[in-house]
């Protein structure tokens, strides 16, 4: 281990400076015997991490139970109420404007509403007929009747439904008073002259011989 010392004295009294340098040359190799990993270090790390994760989730769940998460089911009725109130307000405003202007409700809207009511009634009657047919077939099958009787019941129910639909369509057509024929009296009353939109076209073929006649003269 070499050692080098250097002393230096300045002109200032009672101030002596001394520099010393020391060098250590360790030729021995570094040993890593104490730094070997434990045999079950991976297993220990896994279980420690799992325990930390469980504790963290426990605290998160406790905080959620205290504060409470938002419930989307409670938000949907509120939105529906808002929509219904907005629709009601819109209808009220429309009625007020109609009352101010003095205009009556158009016939087209009334026909649409009647058509929708007719469709709803048809669907309800169809569902009732299907349930009645199912009840009849179930009861008769429990008694032990044959398939022919069940088919007859189905045909009877189907005929009843068709008759009810035909009657309702006839009533609906009578209500709207839609004509299903063409009035030919108006067409017969009109003559050929009335059907013409303008004067007949001028034929230019008659003028051609006259022109040639003038040229010959």
UniProtKB/Swiss-Prot annotation:
| Top-level taxon of the source organism | Eukaryota
- What's a Pfam family in this record? MRAP
Q: Mention any one GO cellular component term assigned to this protein in its UniProt record.
A: endoplasmic reticulum
Keyword presence, Endoplasmic reticulum: yes
Which InterPro entries does UniProt cross-reference here?
MRAP (IPR028111)
Q: Which GO terms describe its biological process?
A: developmental growth; energy homeostasis; energy reserve metabolic process; negative regulation of adenylate cyclase-activating G protein-coupled receptor signaling pathway; protein localization to cell surface; protein localization to plasma membrane; regulation of adenylate cyclase-activating G protein-coupled receptor signaling pathway; regulation of growth
Give one GO molecular function term.
corticotropin hormone receptor binding
Q: What keywords are annotated for this sequence in UniProt?
A: Cell membrane, Endoplasmic reticulum, Glycoprotein, Membrane, Transmembrane, Transmembrane helix
Glycosylation positions? 8
- Transmembrane segments in this chain: where? 42-62
Q: What protein family is recorded?
A: Belongs to the MRAP family.
How is the subunit organization of this protein annotated in UniProt?
Interacts with mc4r.
Q: What else is known?
A: Two paralogs of MRAP2 are present in zebrafish: mrap2a, which plays a role during larval development and mrap2b, which constitutes the ortholog of mammalian MRAP2.
Q: What is this protein called?
A: Melanocortin-2 receptor accessory protein 2A
